[in-house]
């Protein structure tokens, strides 16, 4: 919605759609003040949980979200319900998991103290190999890629 190519002071926004029974925001990644990361952003997730095959939101549906730090000072797996908000102050986060039958939407809001706006991230090295297996894969047609100018795929 609001990538680094658009005008803003420090805010970045992105939307993610995760079909029911699937994962997103994986491999776990971070955008914090760590030596290997080029940016320092805090991130807030705003979740909506739907009902498969409808445009309705679900009071009963749920998902999961994981956040952790290498030193173990943060290590949480939280159950997400429709309308929940989760703040990631630092550390690796992901995956977000949508329960079968309950597609998940989330709005990511990022901001940080740096002068340059960037959505850059660093994968958890333990799981980075997973990203390398995606080369050549077609995007999932249930998750359309769009910009402010419309659908790109």
Task: For the regions a language model picked out, list residue spans one by one.
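Short Gly/Pro-enriched loop/turn and capping motifs at secondary-structure junctions
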Residues: 51-54, 70-73, 92-95, 101-102, ...
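Short edge beta-strand segments in beta-sheet-rich domains
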Residues: 42, 75, 101-106
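A short beta-strand-loop-beta hairpin characteristic of the jelly-roll/cupin
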Residues: 47-82
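Conserved metal-binding segment of the jelly-roll/cupin
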Residues: 79-101
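Intrinsic-disorder/low-complexity, polar/charged segments enriched in Ser/Thr/Lys/Arg/Asp/Glu/Gln
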Residues: 11-13, 75, 85
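Beta-sheet entry/capping signal
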Residues: 62, 85, 103-105
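Double-stranded beta-helix
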Residues: 1-3, 100, 107-153
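A short glycine-rich, His/Asp/Glu-containing loop-to-beta-strand
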Residues: 1-44
